[in-house]
Amino acid sequence: NVALPDRPGSLGLLASAIGAAGGDIRALAVVKSEDGRGYDDITVAVPGNDPTDLLNVLGAIGGVEVLSITPL
C-alpha cells in the first residue's frame, strides 16, 4: 500500500521506479484520493523476493510513502 501526491504523472513515476528496481507490477488498485494524496494497492513481483532494493528506490521518490507491504 502506497501514498503518493495526487497529481498527473505521479503514478507513472512510481511505476517506472518499480520497473527500474527490477519489480514487475502484477496488479494495481486505486483505493482513494484524499487531501491531495492518492492511495494505491500495488502487487509487485520482486526479484529474489527481497523488497529492500525496491523500498530504497521508492523511498527516494519525493512524496511517495510505502504504508505497508504484505509478502505473498
Feature-to-residue mapping (PLM):
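A conserved regulatory-domain signal marking ACT and ACT-like small-molecule sensing domains
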Residues: 1-72
